[in-house]
Amino acid sequence: MPTINQLIRKGRKSKVSKSNAPALNFGYNSYKKVATNNPAPQKRGVATRVGTMTPKKPNSALRKYARVRLSNLIEVTAYIPGIGHNLQEHSVVLIRGGRVKDLPGVRYHVIRGALDTAGVEDRRQSRSKYGTKKPKK
C-alpha cells in the first residue's frame, strides 16, 4: 500500500490493455518498408500453408488451419471454421480476430464466403457465420 507521499510523487499508472489479435493492429508502408499503426477489424492475406492439427487434451479431432501472410507482412495461423473448405496454398483469404481455445497459437479465424474462401455447403442454420447463401425453396 503506497503512502500519500508516494502517490503525490509518482501517481497511479493506468493499466495498458494487451490486444488478443495483435497482427490486426499494424499496416505496412511498402515505400518506406516500415510497419505503421493502422488497426483494422479484418485483414487480407495469402495462405502459405493449409493443413490440420490436433487439439490439446482432452479433445480429439483434426482441426483445419491455414498459415497466412497478411498484407502487413506478418505471418499468422488462422482457423478454418465449418465442414469442408476449398483453400490451398496461394489462396487469398480474409481473417478476423478470435482464438480457438484448444489450438495453441491460433488467434485468428478465416472468414468464410469472402475472397477465395467458399461458404459452407448445405448449411441451414447460422448461415451468416459460414458465408452460405439462402437456400432456394
Curated annotation (Swiss-Prot):
SUPFAM superfamilies given in the database record: Nucleic acid-binding proteins (SSF50249)
Recorded GO CC terms: small ribosomal subunit
A single BP term in Gene Ontology: translation
Keywords from the named record: Ribonucleoprotein, Ribosomal protein, RNA-binding, rRNA-binding, tRNA-binding
Keyword Transport among UniProt keywords: no
GO molecular function, one term: rRNA binding
The keyword RNA-binding belongs to this UniProt entry's keyword annotation: yes
Summary of subunit composition and partner proteins: Part of the 30S ribosomal subunit. Contacts proteins S8 and S17. May interact with IF1 in the 30S initiation complex.
Similarity comment: family membership: Belongs to the universal ribosomal protein uS12 family.
Function: With S4 and S5 plays an important role in translational accuracy. Interacts with and stabilizes bases of the 16S rRNA that are involved in tRNA selection in the A site and with the mRNA backbone. Located at the interface of the 30S and 50S subunits, it traverses the body of the 30S subunit contacting proteins on the other side and probably holding the rRNA structure together. The combined cluster of proteins S8, S12 and S17 appears to hold together the shoulder and platform of the 30S subunit.
Name this protein carries in UniProt: Small ribosomal subunit protein uS12
Organism of provenance: Lactiplantibacillus plantarum (strain ATCC BAA-793 / NCIMB 8826 / WCFS1) (Lactobacillus plantarum)
Gene symbol of the encoding locus: rpsL
